[in-house]
From Swiss-Prot:
It comes from the Eukaryota. Transcription activator involved in the regulation of genes expressed in response to environmental changes and metabolic requirements. According to genome-wide promoter binding and gene expression studies it regulates, among others, genes involved in ribosome biogenesis, protein synthesis, carbohydrate metabolism, and carbohydrate transport. It may also be involved in pleiotropic drug resistance. When overexpressed, it confers resistance to cisplatin, methylmethanosulfonate, and mitomycin C, and increases cellular tolerance to sodium and lithium. InterPro entries: AP-1-like (IPR050936), bZIP (IPR004827), bZIP_sf (IPR046347). Residues 1-64, 83-113, 168-239 are annotated as: Disordered. PROSITE patterns: BZIP_BASIC (PS00036). The keyword Magnesium does not apply. It comes from Saccharomyces cerevisiae (strain ATCC 204508 / S288c). The gene is YAP6. Disulfide bonds: none annotated. This is AP-1-like transcription factor YAP6.
Length: 383
């Protein structure tokens, strides 16, 4: 069985950009369960270390007693969905495994990786090269198979894998990130197909030496042990995520029921408020109509008041005229009274003068009688 292929340098840049996109999208998914795979508290140690020693272009892979963990794939460096269920519904197709090529070996040999750089290695799970244009929904960790990639069998090259491992393995321990069961199944499928291809290749290839066979058998046992540990860790993490997700759903269901009851209460309250609002609207219309009627009556009363004011002003003018006439009459009365008094005085004066004249006439009559008597006596005496 061949070792899993490594991600090429151009795939490393693509994985880094996908990791930045996923970290930006993960901040917006607070209410959903995290799709990332839970890492164990203690890093899984593998009981071997690949020490690169090259002599005249040959690769010697030896087993060391000091266990140093090689870098394993971190699925969180790839853009994935927010729902963990989608990770188990669309596994990676085996044709996405990049077969070794001669130009890739040259490129990997000329590529100088930084000392502290971590390479994300996924057994039988990598993205296609950049030359293929793939369009799929965002946050989908398992993109559909593009039309340009054929469903071909996996052909792995031991020399290509060894060179890639020697050029990309860091010198320090890294944390182990486990894959979900769907990815393990796809990895098993890819490795089984790789075993079949190896059996077919063994017919034509020369028989390797004893050291290589020992390394292959020990590596196969270690890979089986590592795969079993990864499966157990992945199942445990999946159960934990499942329980957490179910608890989260139950909590959300309870919150939804509470919100639904509160919404029903608010609906009934809204209906009662709507009825009260309709009653208030009817009362408002009645008050508005009453105000309109009162305004019309007020206008009529204002008109009548204006008419009364006009009549009052007319009466006042007539009263002033009558008062002026009364004043004039008083003046005329005084004048008539004076004339009346003068006429009475004139009448009295006239009566007094007539009495004086009558008295004078009586005196004259008396004088005449006395004279007649005197004359009669003289005549008698003469006779």
């Amino acid at each position: 069985m061949q070792n899993p292929p490594l991600i090429r340098p151009d795939m490393y840049n693509q994985g880094s950009s996908s990791m930045a996109t996923y970290n930006a999208s993960e901040k917006n998914l607070n209410e959903h369960p995290s799709p990332q795979i839970a890492q164990p508290s203690t890093s899984q140690k593998l009981p071997y270390r690949i020490n690169p020693t090259t002599t005249n272009g040959d690769t010697d892979i030896s087993v060391n007693s000091n266990p140093i963990q090689p870098p394993l794939p971190n699925l969180m460096h790839l853009s994935g969905p927010s729902d963990y269920r989608s990770m188990h519904q669309s596994p990676i197709h085996p044709s996405y495994i990049i077969p070794p090529h001669s130009n890739e070996r040259k490129q990997s040999a000329s590529y100088n990786r930084p000392q502290n750089a971590h390479v994300s290695i996924q057994p039988s799970v990598v993205f296609p090269p950049k030359s293929y244009s793939i369009s799929y929904a965002p946050y989908q960790i398992n993109p559909p198979l593009p039309n340009g990639l054929p469903n071909q069998s996996i052909s792995l090259n031991k020399e290509y894998i060894a060179e890639e491992q020697l050029s990309t393995l860091p010198s320090r321990n890294t944390s182990v990130t486990t894959a979900p069961p769907s990815f393990q199944n796809s990895a098993d499928t890819a490795k089984n197909s790789a075993d079949n291809n190896d059996n077919n290749d063994n017919v034509t290839k020369p028989v390797p030496d004893k050291d290589t066979q020992l390394i292959s058998s020990s590596g196969k046992t270690l890979r089986n042990t590592r795969r079993a540990a990864q499966n157990r860790t992945a199942q445990k993490a999946f159960r934990q995520r499942k329980e957490k997700y179910i608890k989260n759903l139950e909590q959300k269901s309870k919150i939804f029921d509470d919100l639904l009851a509160e919404n029903n209460n608010f609906k009934s309250l809204n209906d009662s408020l709507r009825n009260d609002n309709n009653i208030l609207i009817a009362q408002h219309e009645a008050i508005r109509n009453a105000i309109t009627m009162l305004r019309s009556e007020y206008d009529v009363l204002c008109n009548e008041n204006n008419m009364l004011k006009n009549e009052n002003s007319i009466i006042k003018n007539e009263h002033n005229m009558s008062r002026n006439e009364n004043e004039n009459l008083k003046l005329e009365n005084k004048r008539f009274h004076a004339e009346y008094i003068r006429m009475i005085e004139d009448i009295e004066n006239t009566k007094r003068k007539e009495q004086e004249q009558r008295d004078e006439i009586e005196q004259l009559k008396k004088k005449i009688r006395s004279l007649e008597e005197i004359v009669g006596r003289h005549s008698d005496s003469a006779t």
